[in-house]
């Protein structure tokens, strides 16, 4: 167990935390949904992704943290789906944010 990260400005009690890397989650999504996602195609899948982003926007305007969390998960799952059907490795793609040489990054 480790101490949970800051959430809304406060620390929660010690909770079990499962660590999963981006590739592991992307593989889970691919195993469950890739066949169907490929049949649906990129344009329709992108529309599902946008719908989930809209649901996240609505959730963010509320005080329902559980719903906000659920919608973040949905957005990330659909982002993984899009990455899977366009052959993008999200973990590799996100590595550009791990250094100081990110375009537009200005160290403080």
Residue spans for each PLM region:
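Flexible "arm" and connector segments at domain edges
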Residues: 2-72, 76-108
